[in-house]
A protein has these predicted regions:
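Non-catalytic C-terminal accessory region of glycerolipid acyltransferases
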Residues: 2-9, 20, 24, 43, ...
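Membrane-anchoring hydrophobic helices of lipid-metabolizing enzymes
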Residues: 2-144, 181, 188
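Short Gly/charged-rich anion-binding patches and loops
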Residues: 35, 68, 128, 152, ...
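Generic structural signal for isolated residues within well-ordered alpha-helices
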Residues: 38, 72, 156, 179-182, ...
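Residues that cap or flank secondary-structure elements
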Residues: 61, 121-122, 145, 172, ...
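Catalytic core of membrane glycerolipid acyltransferases/transacylases, capturing the structured
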Residues: 109, 134-195, 221-226, 232
Length: 313
């Protein structure tokens, strides 16, 4: 019997955690994932996308994220009917399923050639902005959001000769993380795992005159509170903080999923962030400005954003 005031030990739970985090477990899971990747590749791009979307919609019927998404959509779009919001939600699950299988075909999916624009599956709005960032000799920041297939952005930038140092969340499985790193870095710029040292690596890249990219639409517990769809959220202030420190251009970028397996990539002109009385970028107001841009994107294509995330806490 456990003594009063002391927690019971959970040896089975600890043992399970140790086993699942072991090298053997990581290797076994990676073996299964690699087999699944091979199976997806054998389906071909179009069929795999349809299957991925259908599977995601089916799974979505049974998970708690669907209830959260319905709650988020009702708060964000009270003017829409329940049927309209449900249609958006089905689009969210379809898009997520498609995005997951598109990882397998990312090298073929981004078939853009800067010398022959308009011939592949990727339309680009803001070619002049890509070229200006590439040639201006300045560091730069690109912010984006989890819209459509967000991985396409960095690949397109690299095709225009603009490699971007990108922040990403590494999988907990070390073997899978290494696979993804190798695959991604062959197609885009350097990847920096989002951890405690990430800010220093990103800052070092800007010191070298490079360009950095980051997704800024998810919850950040230590960030300032800013409005998002009429409600306060804790937002990631890193874009505004870096822009304040380096006084470099800030651009927004997004991917839009189009019919028939096509995409449109858009890079905005420099976004003017508010400044304080000393002429420096105001971090809180700058973060609010970034989130207002993201909100505009989401309102335009709500079915292409991840409403499954607990954004309002």
């Amino acid at each position: 019997m456990a003594l009063p005031g002391k927690k019971k030990k959970k040896p089975f739970k600890k043992l399970t955690r140790r086993i699942t985090r072991s090298k053997a477990a990581h290797a076994s899971i990676a073996f299964v994932v690699r087999g699944m990747v091979a199976g997806v590749r054998s389906l071909g791009e179009e069929r795999a996308g349809r299957v991925g979307g259908a599977v995601a919609r089916f799974v979505g019927r049974f998970v708690s994220e669907t209830r959260l998404a319905r709650k988020n959509l009702a708060a964000a779009f009270p003017e829409k009917s329940a049927a309209e919001r449900e249609k958006i939600l089905q689009g969210v699950w379809s898009g997520l399923g498609q995005t997951m299988v598109e990882y397998v075909f990312l090298d073929k999916l981004v078939d853009i050639d800067p010398e022959r624009l308009g011939e592949g599956r990727i339309e680009v709005v803001g070619v002049d902005q890509f070229l200006a960032m590439r040639d201006d000799g300045k560091p730069g920041i690109i912010f984006s959001a989890h819209l459509a297939n967000w991985e396409i952005l960095a690949v397109v930038a690299a095709r225009f000769g603009l490699p971007v140092v990108s922040l990403f969340r590494a999988p907990t499985n070390n073997v899978i993380a290494e696979d993804l790193m190798q695959q991604r870095e062959q197609m885009m710029g350097k990847l920096v795992a989002s951890n405690r040292g990430a800010t220093f690596e990103v800052g070092a890249a800007l010191d070298r005159g490079e360009h950095v990219g980051m997704l800024c639409d998810q919850h950040h517990s230590r960030g300032p509170k800013v409005p998002f769809f009429g409600r306060p959220v804790h937002a990631n202030p890193l874009v505004a903080r870096l822009a304040r420190h380096y006084d470099c251009p800030v651009h927004g970028a997004r991917t839009v999923r189009l019919p028939n397996g096509r995409f449109r990539v858009e890079l905005t002109p420099p976004v003017e962030l508010p400044r304080d009385a000393e002429g420096l970028i105001d971090v809180d107001a700058g973060t609010a400005k970034v989130m207002s841009v993201v909100e505009g994107w989401v309102r335009e294509h709500p079915e292409q954003w991840l409403w499954l995330h607990n954004r309002w806490r």
